[in-house]
Each structure stands twice: as structure tokens, then as C-alpha cells.
Amino acid sequence: MMVMNPLTATFLAALIGTAASASCGSSGIPFRFEVLPSGQPVLGCGSPTCFGAENGGRDLRHDSSFMAGADGDDGFFRDGDLARVRVRDPDAPAQMANCPREFSSSSCSNPMTWVGGFKASDNGDLSLQCCHYEGLRFAQEVGRPVVHPGEVYSGGEVLRDGRQTGFDAISNVRKITSGDGTVAYEVTVTRMNCLPNPGEESNEVSFDIQRDIGRILDKVGETAASGVQTNHIEADQRLSPSTDVQSDSYVSPTEADPQEPVEQFVQVGEQVVPVTSAGYYYPVASGVPACFTGNSKVMTPAGEKSMADLSVGDMVMTYEYGKMTYTRVASWLHRLPDTKAAFIKLTTEQGAIIDMTPQHFIYKANCVTEEMELVYAEDMTIGDCLMVKENEKLVMTTISEKSTFYETGVYAPMTETGDLIVDDVYASCHNVVKANTLSHTFLNFATSVQQKMRSVLGSLEETGHLPATSEFFLNIIDVLLPHKY
């Protein structure tokens, strides 16, 4: 029998009796908020390529802090973020947050702040650490998901056409208590500009400034003369994620009364790119994860089950090695029953119908060779081919209809094989990130390590969510690997 040192026991007792506190520090941004089944909140922090350093990107502060409890740490920092090399000009301003030492705020309502940390009491009340960052000056709120016990919200890097353009941070957290005493948290998500630093310290540029400016002005003149439509931006006109957007984004100025001249923005050097499908508006990564609906159906050995009723450890049908088989649900990427999102509905000629968010991956089949590739659901068009289940095999069918709708409840299970059959359609578990084999190798390793750590710490409770290290890996792998491989 192991006897604990009295000093160690006293120290552990002091920790247990102290309110849990988590802080991302001045080099971290809060991007993930999880509520364990026990009610303990967990804060996830990251330091993207556009943030975290001072003195030309050379110095980062390792001042984040987290506290261990019965259910594990109350926060974490993404592995590798603070070790990443940042290439910036030596005179570049610091990209760090100014965080107070105290956790004394009940709300981070200042638009220039985010929730750098929190101190949680036993009843779920949070005392917030509101960190100020100048880079939030042009940020915009994009959503307010509600996270209940056993659920998780994850923001982070925002990619458009494979390029990082922003970062979704948690700017405020508000406790919500229902009539039956259940505690949940409303998370305010703010999107800030987050362009990655260049890959090199310097590059050659032309020094003929007059010639270059002249070429740009000539290009603007040619564009205007050729009748290219420009967008008129009126004062105080803003589009929010909930704004209805038509397929034509041109705003015609009213002709009733003379108004002040409006400013014209002309994009020089790039072609005008039309909307993929007229009539659709997808709030791309607008603080809402890529997932399936709660009504989506999967097949288990015991019969059909809806996504909302699925649990970690369940066996679901997939297609592997040329035949139908079952794979285990290893974790949840996202499980947010109260979050509203835009979904795409794909109807096939065979009769199968699948609903998923625009940036969830699905297997598109070559209609001639049946060779499959992963593409975003939003990139599928009428006439494209999908693989659907028929008896005990996959057969090819074409998409006959495509529509969009809004629904509450988003679910993204992660299986051990990385794919599954949803509503008889062969689909991927992944969103934003395609890499299947590599990410699952890492996922299995990280899950194994986490389980061993729990057994050492004496906590056997399974939260059913993606391990922190895997969350980081899945968020950045699209940057590390080419899109075609």
C-alpha cells in the first residue's frame, strides 16, 4: 500500500479547495470552450501565426497557467504554437495581449478584449480575466453558441480557399441557468483578421515606384472603361452573419435625393469571382463548426440511430476494404445541440438525401471512373456523382437537387476510420482538414496518451471529446500538407 507524503497531501488538499483558474496569458488567444459532464469548464488557448510575439517575432511569453482538478486540467495550450518560428520585421510592433493579474470581471463587454482566462467556482460562476488586444479593432462578432455539460465549441483559424484569413476567438462567456438548475454557458465568438506572416524575411521588389503606380492607375482606368461592376459601400453599412445576402452582392444607390459621394473599391490584378451557386449564401466558418444535423441517421449493429443519440464508443457503419463494416466512434469533433447553422441538402437520383454544413467533406465520385476525392459539400453541384449504400455495397448515383436551410443542432463524430455512412451516403468525418490517415494516426496516439493520463490521475470519466493535442493537429494539418496528394 502506497503512503502519501504528508506535505504532498497538504498541497493537494490546498489545490482541491481552491477555485479552478485558467489563463491563456499574453501570448495566447482563447479559441475553445468545453464543459465536462461534471460541469467543469475547460479553456483552450492557441497562438496562431499572426499573434503572440514581440521584438520582431523573436520573443514569446510563456505565462499561461492552468490548474489540475479531479477531471483533469481546466485548460490547455495547443502543442507547438509557442515553438513556431515567426518571420517578422525586427521593428514590427508586438502582437501580444495586455492581461490583468486579477480575475475580477463578470463580463468582457469591451470590443477590444477577449476572455484571457477565468476562475470557476463550485456553482459554475465565472470570474473573467479580460485581456486587451489592439488587433481586435476591426474584429466582428460572428456567433453566440451555447455550450452545455458534455459539449464543446472550438473556433481557431479561418480558412478561405485554403488560405488563412482570420481567427475565431472567444470574447465573452456568460453563465446561463435553466429552470431545472442546469448550468450552460453562452460563448461570444469574435472573428479577428489573422493573416500569416510571410515565409521569408525579405523578397525582391521593384524600385520604379512611379512606373508601378502608373500601371495600377492604368489598370483601374481600363477596368472602369470596360464596364466592370464595382461595389458601392455606403457609410455605416455592414453585413452580419445573420444578414440575408442575395446572389448578386451589388448595392445600387438610391436616386431619390442627392447623397454624399460614396467610395468605390476596385480590386486590381485579380479577376472577379462569381458566387459558386447563385442564390446560396454560406456563412463560411462563421463561428459555427462543420457538422451533420441531429436528425442525420447512421446504422449501428442494433439498428438505425440518429446523430443526436450517438455516443462515443458506438459502432457505426462505414465502407472499408471493398465491403461494408463497422467502425467505432472515437470522439466528438463538435456536439452542439443548441447551435444554429446553415446546412446544404443534397438529393440524389437514387433517393438518398444527406444534410451537412457547407465546409464538411464528402466523397465526390468521378462519374466515369468512380474514382473518389474529398470535396466541400458547398462545391457539389447538380449532376455530380456520390457513392451511396445499396444492399452491402456502394453504388454511384448523381445529385438531382441541391438546396440550403437553417437548423439548430450540429454534430460531428470522429470515427476510427475517418469516414462513415450517413443517410446511406458515404461521407467523411472531417471538416476543413482532408488529411485522413495522418490525422488518425495522431488521433489514436493522443487518445491513448490521454486515457493513460486519466488512469494515473485517478479520473475514469470519459468526456467523449476530441483530445486537445488532436484538436490542434487537425486545425493546422491543412497548412502543412498540400491540397492534392
UniProtKB/Swiss-Prot annotation:
<comment type="function">
    <text>Intercellular signal essential for a variety of patterning events during development.</text>
</comment>
<dbReference type="GO" id="GO:0090597">
    <property type="term" value="P:nematode male tail mating organ morphogenesis"/>
</dbReference>
<dbReference type="InterPro" id="IPR036844">
    <property type="entry name" value="Hint_dom_sf"/>
</dbReference>
<feature type="region of interest" description="Disordered">
    <location>
        <begin position="236"/>
        <end position="258"/>
    </location>
</feature>
<feature type="site" description="Essential for auto-cleavage">
    <location>
        <position position="360"/>
    </location>
</feature>
<dbReference type="InterPro" id="IPR052140">
    <property type="entry name" value="Dev_Signal_Hedgehog-like"/>
</dbReference>
<feature type="signal peptide">
    <location>
        <begin position="1"/>
        <end position="21"/>
    </location>
</feature>
<keyword id="KW-0472">Membrane</keyword>
<dbReference type="GO" id="GO:0007367">
    <property type="term" value="P:segment polarity determination"/>
</dbReference>
<keyword id="KW-0378">Hydrolase</keyword>
<protein>
    <recommendedName>
        <fullName>Warthog protein 1</fullName>
    </recommendedName>
</protein>
<feature type="compositionally biased region" description="Polar residues">
    <location>
        <begin position="239"/>
        <end position="252"/>
    </location>
</feature>
<dbReference type="InterPro" id="IPR006141">
    <property type="entry name" value="Intein_N"/>
</dbReference>
<dbReference type="GO" id="GO:0005886">
    <property type="term" value="C:plasma membrane"/>
</dbReference>
<feature type="site" description="Involved in auto-cleavage">
    <location>
        <position position="357"/>
    </location>
</feature>
<dbReference type="GO" id="GO:0031012">
    <property type="term" value="C:extracellular matrix"/>
</dbReference>
<keyword id="KW-0964">Secreted</keyword>
<comment type="similarity">
    <text>Belongs to the hedgehog family.</text>
</comment>
<dbReference type="Pfam" id="PF01079">
    <property type="entry name" value="Hint"/>
</dbReference>
<dbReference type="InterPro" id="IPR003586">
    <property type="entry name" value="Hint_dom_C"/>
</dbReference>
<dbReference type="InterPro" id="IPR003587">
    <property type="entry name" value="Hint_dom_N"/>
</dbReference>
<keyword id="KW-1003">Cell membrane</keyword>
<dbReference type="InterPro" id="IPR001767">
    <property type="entry name" value="Hedgehog_Hint"/>
</dbReference>
<dbReference type="GO" id="GO:0009986">
    <property type="term" value="C:cell surface"/>
</dbReference>
<dbReference type="InterPro" id="IPR001657">
    <property type="entry name" value="Hedgehog"/>
</dbReference>
<dbReference type="GO" id="GO:0016539">
    <property type="term" value="P:intein-mediated protein splicing"/>
</dbReference>
<dbReference type="GO" id="GO:0007267">
    <property type="term" value="P:cell-cell signaling"/>
</dbReference>
<dbReference type="GO" id="GO:0008233">
    <property type="term" value="F:peptidase activity"/>
</dbReference>
<feature type="site" description="Cleavage; by autolysis">
    <location>
        <begin position="290"/>
        <end position="291"/>
    </location>
</feature>
<dbReference type="GO" id="GO:0016540">
    <property type="term" value="P:protein autoprocessing"/>
</dbReference>
<keyword id="KW-0732">Signal</keyword>
<keyword id="KW-0217">Developmental protein</keyword>
<dbReference type="GO" id="GO:0005576">
    <property type="term" value="C:extracellular region"/>
</dbReference>
<keyword id="KW-0068">Autocatalytic cleavage</keyword>
<keyword id="KW-0645">Protease</keyword>
